C-alpha cells in the first residue's frame, strides 16, 4: 500500500510541476461565452484593471444577464462531476452593494453561487455538497469598497482556499462539492435572477478554471503545493474502488469454489427419469404407443403412426406384448379360420369327447387338456369356452388371468373372455383398445363450459374456470361478481368502488389523489417544513411549526415553552430554539440545551477587559469592573482595540458605522445607533426602517410578498433583510456543538448531536478509521458497497462503523 501511495504522489507532483500555463480547454471565460458587449442591455464596456481583456460596468437593475440553454450546457459539461476548480474575477464593487457575482442554480438549489455583501462586509460561497444539502461558507472581508481587487476561490475536494490580491486570506476544510447539475439549470452573471442579487460595479476576467490550483493564472508567482486535496481524495477513491473490485472478486471466487464442490458431489449429465428408468440426454425409447426422447432433461413424446406390415405366406399382422404396432406373426389355418401362434381351439370329437388343438409352427397340433377342477356353481351357470375343454362359472374373472391393457386402458370381463376398454375421457390408439390417449375436450369442442368461463383440459376430463371478475355457480357456469358489494376489491379506504362487467374500478374520493388502489390526501397549498398531509387540506406539522400549511414557526422563547438558565438568552430558530450564553459568559464545553453550561468569563484574567493602566480590573459575574487603587486619582479612561479612549468619550466603530460606543469609567459600552425617523438627516443605511421610498421596498424570493426597507425574515435557513431595495441574506447562526455524529432534522436548519452514526447525515470523516465488511475486506470511511449475498442491501463505512440498509425501490425492481 505504501508503495502505491508513493507512486501516486510522484505522478501528482510531476503533473503539478509540469508548468504554470493554463490549458485553454480547462478555462471557461464567462464573458466570452456570454458574448457580452456594448449591445448587451444593462451593462457597459468600460476601462478595466488592465487592457488585456474587456471590463463591464454592471449598474442598471433592468438587466437580465442569463446564459442561453446551449451556452449553459456547454459550460456545465466542463464542470459536471468535477471536484477541483477555481472561480476567478477582477472586480471593483460599489460601496454598500450586496450582489451576486456568479450563480448556478436549479429551482431552490444553489449548486454554486458567489456573492459579496457590502451590508455585512463579507463574501459568501453557496454550494451543494455531496450529501445533497445546501452549504454556505462565509468569509468576513470588505470587498465592496469601490476599489480594484483580484479575487479567486479555489475548491479541491474538501479543501478551499481564498485569495484576494494574490494573498491567501482564508483556507478551510469544507464538505465536498456536488456539481452534478441537472438539465434546465440556470447560469446568471451579476445577479441571482431577474429580481434579486444585483451586483453593482465593474467586473473583468470572470473565469472558471477546471484544474488544480487555478489561481496561478491570475497570480503566477503564488506557490503551488503537491499534490492537491482533490488528488489525495482521488487516490483514496481509487483505493476504495480497488477494494470493491477485490471484494467482488473474492465473492465470485468463493461462489465458484462452492459450486465446484457441489459439482464434485453430483451427477451432472442431463438425464430424464421416467417410470423409474433413467435415460441419458438425446436417448430415445418406446413408451407404449409413444416414441420419447430425452431433451434438455425433459422427456418429449409423440404418438406413433402405425402402418400395416406386408407379411409373407404363413404370417399375418398381429399385436405383440410390449409393442404398439402390429408385427408379422406365424398363423395356422383350421376349418377355414386363422389362428395365431399359441392360440387354442376346443373341438368336440365324434365320441363327444373334448379335443384341444394349439397353433404351433403354422400347424394346429393336438395337445393334452389340463385336468378340470370342480366348479362351485350350478350346472346352469356353466359356460363352455372355445379356447379350452374346461368349463368355467358364469362371471369368471378372466382379467385376473392376465391381460395386455396398458396406458389409460382397463381390463373388462365378458362372458367368455377379457377385453380392453379406454377409460372415460380417453380414446383408443388401436382397435384392441390396449393403448389409449387423452381426449382434449376443449380444443375439440366436446365440453359443456358456458359463457364467462374458460375451458381447461385435464387428463380424462376438463374443467370450467371462471373469467376474472366472475363467480362460479356450478361446474359449468359463472356469473358476474360484484367485488364492491362483497368487499373483495382492491380499492383504497379513501376511494369509491364502482362495479364493472368482469371487474371493478377504484376512484379516489374528493380531496385525495392516486390511482384508486392507493389514495393520498391532497393539501391545496401543500405542507411546508416537513409537514404531512393527513386529510384533505389538513397538515400534521412537525414539532416547532404550526399553521394550516405548517408555514409558521413556533417561537418557543416568546411563547414561554422553554426556560433558559439565568446566564443564557433564548434564541428562536426555525422549528427549534437554543439557549445562548449572555455577554460575559461562555459555554464550558458541555453544550447543555437549557444554558446550564454557561459560566462566567474572567475578563481580567483573559485580558478581555477595557480598563486603562491606572485602574485595576475586578472580575464580576457576567462582567467586570475597573477600580481605582486606594489613594490614587484615576482617569477612568478605557482601552478599546488597542487605543485609549477617554472617560466620557463617544465614537463610531471603524468597521460598523451603525454602532456607537462610549467610555464610562473604564468600561466600554457599545450599542446600535438610535434611529430618529423624524430627523431628515438620519442615516438610512443604519436606519433602513426610516426609508419611506417605494423604490427601497424588496420583493420576497417567492415573488408573493413585499417588504419595507429594514424588514427581516427567514428563508431557506437564511436570515434575510431588505436594505434600500436590496435583499441580503446570510446563514442563520447555529449553536456550537461538539460531537462526532450529528443530524439536521427535516424542516430545521441547525445540526443536533446523535449517538447512532448510522442515523447521522453530517460526519467528520476520518479515513484512518476503517470497517471490516462481511467478507473480511477492509473498507475506508466513506466507501459504500452492496452486501455480499444480497442485491438490495447497501452498506457504508461511517468513521469505523458499518451501516447497512435495504433499498425498497431496489426490492420493487427485482
Swiss-Prot record:
Annotated S-S bridges: 399-411, 405-420, 422-436, 442-455, 449-464, 466-478, 484-497, 491-506, 508-519, 523-533, 527-539, 541-550, 557-570, 564-579, 581-598, 604-617, 611-626, 628-634
UniProt: Ca(2+) binding residues: 438-439, 441, 457-458, 461, 553-554, 556, 572-573, 576, 600-601, 603, 619-620, 623
Laminin G-like domain span: 53-226
Position of the signal peptide: 1-19
Record keyword Repeat present: yes
Gene Ontology BP annotations: fertilization
Organism annotation: Xenopus tropicalis
A molecular-function term among this protein's GO annotations: calcium ion binding
The protein, known as: Protein kinase C-binding protein NELL2
InterPro entries: ConA-like_dom_sf, EGF-like_Ca-bd_dom, EGF-like_dom, EGF-type_Asp/Asn_hydroxyl_site, EGF_Ca-bd_CS, EGF_dom, Growth_fac_rcpt_cys_sf, Laminin_G
Glycosylation, residue list: 51, 223, 296, 515, 613, 633
Amino acid at each position: 500500500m505504501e508503495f502505491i501511495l508513493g507512486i501516486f504522489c510522484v505522478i501528482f507532483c510531476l503533473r503539478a510541476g509540469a508548468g504554470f500555463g493554463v490549458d485553454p480547454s480547462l478555462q471557461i471565460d464567462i464573458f466570452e461565452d456570454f458574448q457580452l458587449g456594448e449591445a448587451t442591455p444593462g451593462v457597459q464596456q468600460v476601462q478595466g484593471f488592465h487592457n488585456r481583456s474587456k471590463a463591464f460596468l454592471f449598474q442598471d437593475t433592468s438587466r437580465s444577464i442569463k446564459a442561453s440553454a446551449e451556452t449553459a450546457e456547454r459550460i456545465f459539461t466542463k464542470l459536471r462531476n468535477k471536484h477541483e476548480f477555481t472561480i476567478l474575477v477582477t472586480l471593483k464593487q460599489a460601496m454598500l452593494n450586496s450582489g451576486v457575482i456568479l450563480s448556478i442554480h436549479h429551482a431552490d438549489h444553489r449548486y454554486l453561487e458567489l456573492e459579496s455583501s457590502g451590508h455585512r462586509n463579507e463574501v459568501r460561497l453557496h454550494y451543494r455538497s455531496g450529501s445533497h444539502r445546501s452549504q454556505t461558507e462565509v468569509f468576513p472581508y470588505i470587498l465592496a469598497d469601490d476599489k480594484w481587487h483580484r479575487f479567486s476561490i479555489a475548491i479541491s475536494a474538501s479543501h478551499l482556499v481564498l485569495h484576494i490580491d494574490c494573498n491567501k486570506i482564508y483556507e478551510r476544510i469544507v464538505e465536498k462539492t456536488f456539481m452534478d447539475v441537472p438539465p434546465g439549470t440556470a447560469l446568471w452573471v451579476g445577479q441571482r435572477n431577474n429580481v434579486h442579487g444585483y451586483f453593482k460595479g465593474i467586473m473583468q476576467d470572470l473565469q472558471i478554471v477546471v484544474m488544480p490550483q487555478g489561481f496561478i493564472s491570475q497570480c503566477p508567482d503564488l506557490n503551488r503545493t503537491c499534490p492537491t486535496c482533490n488528488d489525495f481524495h482521488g487516490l483514496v477513491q481509487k483505493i476504495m474502488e480497488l477494494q470493491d473490485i477485490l471484494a467482488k472478486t473474492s465473492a465470485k471466487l468463493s461462489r465458484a469454489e462452492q459450486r465446484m464442490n457441489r459439482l464434485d458431489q453430483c451427477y451432472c449429465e442431463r438425464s430424464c427419469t421416467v417410470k423409474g428408468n433413467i435415460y441419458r440426454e438425446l436417448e430415445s425409447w418406446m413408451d407404449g404407443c409413444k416414441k420419447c426422447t430425452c431433451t434438455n432433461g425433459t422427456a418429449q413424446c409423440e404418438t406413433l403412426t402405425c402402418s400395416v406390415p406386408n407379411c409373407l405366406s404363413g404370417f399375418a399382422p398381429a399385436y405383440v406384448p410390449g409393442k404398439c404396432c402390429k408385427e408379422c406373426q406365424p398363423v395356422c389355418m383350421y376349418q377355414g379360420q386363422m389362428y395365431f401362434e399359441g392360440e387354442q381351439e376346443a373341438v368336440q370329437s365324434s365320441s363327444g369327447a373334448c379335443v384341444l388343438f394349439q397353433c404351433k409352427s403354422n400347424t394346429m397340433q393336438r395337445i393334452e387338456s389340463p385336468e378340470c377342477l370342480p366348479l362351485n356353481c350350478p350346472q346352469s351357470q356353466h359356460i363352455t369356452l372355445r379356447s379350452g375343454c374346461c368349463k368355467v362359472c358364469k362371471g369368471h374373472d378372466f382379467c385376473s388371468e392376465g391381460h395386455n391393457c396398458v396406458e389409460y386402458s382397463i381390463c373388462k370381463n365378458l362372458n367368455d373372455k377379457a377385453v380392453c376398454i379406454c377409460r372415460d375421457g380417453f380414446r383408443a390408439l388401436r382397435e384392441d383398445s390396449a393403448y389409449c390417449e387423452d381426449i382434449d375436450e376443449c380444443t375439440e369442442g366436446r365440453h359443456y363450459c358456458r359463457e364467462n368461463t374458460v375451458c381447461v383440459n385435464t387428463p380424462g376430463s376438463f374443467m370450467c374456470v371462471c373469467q376474472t371478475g366472475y363467480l362460479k355457480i356450478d361446474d359449468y357456469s359463472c356469473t358476474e361478481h360484484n367485488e364492491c358489494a362483497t368487499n373483495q376489491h382492491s380499492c383504497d379506504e379513501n376511494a369509491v368502488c364502482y362495479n364493472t362487467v368482469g371487474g371493478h374500478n377504484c376512484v379516489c374520493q374528493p380531496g385525495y389523489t392516486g390511482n384508486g388502489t392507493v389514495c393520498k390526501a391532497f393539501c391545496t397549498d401543500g405542507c411546508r417544513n416537513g409537514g404531512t398531509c393527513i386529510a384533505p387540506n389538513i397538515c400534521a406539522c412537525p414539532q416547532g411549526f404550526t399553521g394550516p400549511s405548517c408555514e409558521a414557526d413556533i417561537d418557543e422563547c416568546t411563547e414561554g415553552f422553554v426556560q433558559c438558565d439565568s446566564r443564557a438568552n433564548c434564541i428562536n430558530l426555525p422549528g427549534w430554539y437554543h439557549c445562548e450564553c449572555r455577554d460575559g459568559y461562555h459555554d464550558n464545553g458541555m453544550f447543555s440545551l437549557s444554558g446550564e453550561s454557561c459560566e462566567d468569563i474572567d475578563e481580567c484574567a483573559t485580558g478581555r477587559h477595557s480598563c486603562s493602566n491606572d485602574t485595576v480590573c475586578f472580575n464580576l459575574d457576567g462582567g467586570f469592573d475597573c477600580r481605582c487603587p486606594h489613594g490614587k486619582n484615576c482617569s477612568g479612561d478605557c482601552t478599546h482595540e488597542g487605543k485609549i479612549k477617554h472617560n466620557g468619550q463617544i465614537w463610531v466603530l471603524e468597521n460598523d458605522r451603525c454602532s456607537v460606543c462610549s467610555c464610562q469609567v473604564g468600561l466600554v459600552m457599545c450599542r446600535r445607533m438610535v434611529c430618529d425617523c423624524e430627523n431628515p438627516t438620519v442615516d438610512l443605511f443604519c436606519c433602513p426602517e426610516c426609508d419611506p421610498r417605494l423604490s427601497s421596498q424588496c420583493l420576497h424570493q417567492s415573488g408573493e410578498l413585499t417588504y419595507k426597507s429594514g424588514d427581516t425574515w427567514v428563508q431557506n435557513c437564511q436570515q434575510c433583510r431588505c436594505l434600500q431595495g436590496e435583499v441580503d441574506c446570510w446563514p442563520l447562526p447555529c449553536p456550537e456543538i461538539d460531537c462526532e455524529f450529528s443530524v439536521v432534522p427535516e424542516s430545521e436548519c441547525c445540526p443536533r448531536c446523535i449517538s447512532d452514526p448510522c442515523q447521522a447525515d453530517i460526519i467528520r470523516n476520518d479515513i484512518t478509521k476503517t470497517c471490516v465488511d462481511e467478507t473480511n475486506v477492509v473498507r475506508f470511511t466513506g466507501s459504500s458497497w452492496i452486501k455480499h449475498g444480497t442485491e438490495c442491501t447497501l452498506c457504508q463505512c461511517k468513521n469505523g462503523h458499518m451501516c447497512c440498509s435495504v433499498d425498497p425501490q431496489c426490492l420493487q425492481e427485482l
